[in-house]
């Protein structure tokens, strides 16, 4: 295998961010030089995004051609990919890198790909030297991996190393637990009730830090045991973290399963004390978890596992290939198979009469994972409730102190506090009366939580020094329920009267205060919205008369001045109904509208809309062509008048009769109604015709 890295490849600056998937090679550190993040497969540089064969240094990281082109298209076209539907935690590998483009782009950005990291030119010699040194170190790591793989193939050696690792890191072996159990039965020392986790015997007042420190050395033992398993150091940092995070509680529970004493129905705690099953608190409703844990512990203890079997079973629980997020699944599967074969060998030696014991032991893994999930959920609930309880206690202390301080000022104003008075909204308390202050403060917190009845909100009588103290609280304001028959719009005719229903003979401060507030409340008309007022107001104009005025003929505007004058002289005179135009004067005139009932008379619409009337009375605006035709007609009319005057003068002078003018020789006027020339006709001036 050769290194795919040409001298003319484009290289850029190296980011100092830690690798996402963890390299198998420790980077070469030099002063004032960026850290080199490269993954090798022998002598081949791998892509930082998908693990494929890298083609060079692109956009700041070593990547393949596929990831380089994908990142270039994404940033140049500004593509917005659809969000991931798997919690944005998809594993980007060579075989599935095209399934989730959202997580692939996220991985590209996480490993350090950037448009600004592009640099053109050859690879510097110093960079080449660093890469070659990393390759050599990768070769040595490869040799170490081959040695570890050979160790995995050696079953007796693998078995011995796993058992030795378990005995060195576990404090609760079979012999030690037997001694602790005998000592606890002879001299039982019962611890105080603890939380849902049955292996913590600390008192209730311990902090979370003490709770964590009690299990710190036990958890550290499980982590050290995992590091001593052959082949575990060959995994990447991410794979190590994934295996430990998923199987830590499972392995810890398998180690501590011998601490449960089923006959005595108790637990041997880490400090050697006994704790009864019934004394375990179920603060997080963990009764089901406790019962399931005891049942599973009884099932496991009935198998009487040896230390070698427990060590190998813990290794199998930790090295499981079906954990989500693993990258080197092949190596994990190989380790799991080797450990399982070693456990089969040990069981065959110790339990030759039980051939199905291995299957029976492996069937407990689903129940173990279920208990781990329940424990994690209840632990989260416990932490949330514990923090909430501390917060409530702090708030309770803060509420009591200001309550007593405010009582000093109130007592100065009223020496007797609030004895049968409604002067203040809440009952004050004096510093010298702690019982009264504490009682009222407790009532105040109950009222704020809304857990008291309607009767408890009434008068509270407290006997103190022979006086009846009656704290009066301001009544809460309730929203008025809407009636099913209420449309939401009032008619304005309702009488705002308070209906007094049948009530009790005695009155409470709350009822008197509500009556006082209702008396001071303004009328509903003042609070009525604008929409209700508009709907309740009478119409500004009669709809029928408005339609009549709108549809009157245009002819009425010819006599607008006369109508206006009559309207000014008689503003309340009824307007006659317009008569329709008839083609024959002798035809009977029928009214355009049927006879209406007499209604209030108003001024004509033309007097109120003067602008509209003037615009309608104005003559129509003529186009330039129409104006030109009008001028020509007027010129001909002037010529005819002038010629008639001349002929009349000549006739008077000669004493002759008027001559009929023959228009055959005279110029013919233009016929403006037709485009073709009109035939010759006799022309008579308008004045002669008249």
Curated annotation (Swiss-Prot):
It is found in: Nucleus. A zinc finger (NR C4-type) spans 47-67, 84-108. Keywords: DNA-binding, Metal-binding, Nucleus, Receptor, Transcription, Transcription regulation, Zinc, Zinc-finger. Disulfide bonds: none annotated. PROSITE patterns: NR_LBD (PS51843), NUCLEAR_REC_DBD_1 (PS00031), NUCLEAR_REC_DBD_2 (PS51030). CDD domains: NR_DBD_REV_ERB. GO terms for cellular component: nucleus. Residues 154-401 form the NR LBD domain. Belongs to the nuclear hormone receptor family. NR1 subfamily. Orphan receptor possibly involved in the regulation of genes in the ecdysteroid cascade. This is Ecdysone-inducible protein E75. It comes from Choristoneura fumiferana. The lineage of its organism: Eukaryota, Metazoa, Ecdysozoa, Arthropoda, Hexapoda.
């Amino acid at each position: 295998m050769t290194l795919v890295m040409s001298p003319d490849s484009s290289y850029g600056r190296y980011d100092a961010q830690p690798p996402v998937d963890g390299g198998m090679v420790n980077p070469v550190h030099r002063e004032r030089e960026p850290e080199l993040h490269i993954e090798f497969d022998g002598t081949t540089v791998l892509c930082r995004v998908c693990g494929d064969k890298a083609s060079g240094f692109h956009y700041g990281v070593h990547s393949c051609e596929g990831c380089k082109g994908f990142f270039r298209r994404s940033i140049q076209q500004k593509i917005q990919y659809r969000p991931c539907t798997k919690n944005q935690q998809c594993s980007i590998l060579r075989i599935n890198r095209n399934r989730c483009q959202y997580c692939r782009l996220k991985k590209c950005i996480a490993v350090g790909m950037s448009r600004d990291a592009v640099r053109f030119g050859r690879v510097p010699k110093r960079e080449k030297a660093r890469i070659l040194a990393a390759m050599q170190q990768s070769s040595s790591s490869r040799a170490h991996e081959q040695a570890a793989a050979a160790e995995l193939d050696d079953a007796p050696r693998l078995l011995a190393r796993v058992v030795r690792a378990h005995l060195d890191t576990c404090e609760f072996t079979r012999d030690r637990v037997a001694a602790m159990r005998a000592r606890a039965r002879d001299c039982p020392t019962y611890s105080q009730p603890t939380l849902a986790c049955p292996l913590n015997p600390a008192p209730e007042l311990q902090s979370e830090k003490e709770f964590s420190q009690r299990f710190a050395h036990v958890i550290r033992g499980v982590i050290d045991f995992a590091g001593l398993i052959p082949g575990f150091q060959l995994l990447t940092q991410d794979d190590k973290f994934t295996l430990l995070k998923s199987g830590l509680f499972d392995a810890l529970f398998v180690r501590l399963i011998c601490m449960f004493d089923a006959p005595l129905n108790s637990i041997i705690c880490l400090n050697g004390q006994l704790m009864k099953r019934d004394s375990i608190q179920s603060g997080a409703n963990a009764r089901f978890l406790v019962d399931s844990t005891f049942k599973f512990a009884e099932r496991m203890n009935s198998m009487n596992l040896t230390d070698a079997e427990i060590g190998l079973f813990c290794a199998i629980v930790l090295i499981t290939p079906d954990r989500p997020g693993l990258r080197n699944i092949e190596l994990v599967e190989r380790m799991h198979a080797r450990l399982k074969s070693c456990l089969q060998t040990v069981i065959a030696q110790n339990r030759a009469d039980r051939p199905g014991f291995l299957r029976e032991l492996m069937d407990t893994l689903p129940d173990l994972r279920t208990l781990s999930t329940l424990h994690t959920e209840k632990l989260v609930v416990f932490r949330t409730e514990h923090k909430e309880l501390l917060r409530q206690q702090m708030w309770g202390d803060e509420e009591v102190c200001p309550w007593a301080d405010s009582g000093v000022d109130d007592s100065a104003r009223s020496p007797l506090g609030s004895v049968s008075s409604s002067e203040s909204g809440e009952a004050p308390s004096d510093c010298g009366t702690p019982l009264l202050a504490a009682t009222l403060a407790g009532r105040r917190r109950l009222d704020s939580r809304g857990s008291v009845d309607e009767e408890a909100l009434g008068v509270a009588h407290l006997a103190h020094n022979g006086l009846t103290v009656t704290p009066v609280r301001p009544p809460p304001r309730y929203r008025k329920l809407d009636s099913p028959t209420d449309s939401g719009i009032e008619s304005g005719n309702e009488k705002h009267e308070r209906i007094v229903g049948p009530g009790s003979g005695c009155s409470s401060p709350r009822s008197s205060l509500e009556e006082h507030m209702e008396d001071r409340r303004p009328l509903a008309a003042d609070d009525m919205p604008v929409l209700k007022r508009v709907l309740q107001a009478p119409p500004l104009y009669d709809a029928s008369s408005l339609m009549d005025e709108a549809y009157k003929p245009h002819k009425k505007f010819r006599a607008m001045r006369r109508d206006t004058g009559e309207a000014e002289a008689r503003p309340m005179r009824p307007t006659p109904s317009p008569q329709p135009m008839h083609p024959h004067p002798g035809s009977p005139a029928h009214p355009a509208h049927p006879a209406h009932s007499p209604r209030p008379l108003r001024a004509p619409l033309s007097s109120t809309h003067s602008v509209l009337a003037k615009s309608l009375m104005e003559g129509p605006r003529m186009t330039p062509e129409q104006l030109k035709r009008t001028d020509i007609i007027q010129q001909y009319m002037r010529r005819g008048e002038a010629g008639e005057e001349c002929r009349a003068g000549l006739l008077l002078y000669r004493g002759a009769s008027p001559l009929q003018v023959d228009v055959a020789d005279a110029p013919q006027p233009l016929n403006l109604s037709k485009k073709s020339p009109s035939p010759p006709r006799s022309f008579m001036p308008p004045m002669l015709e008249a």
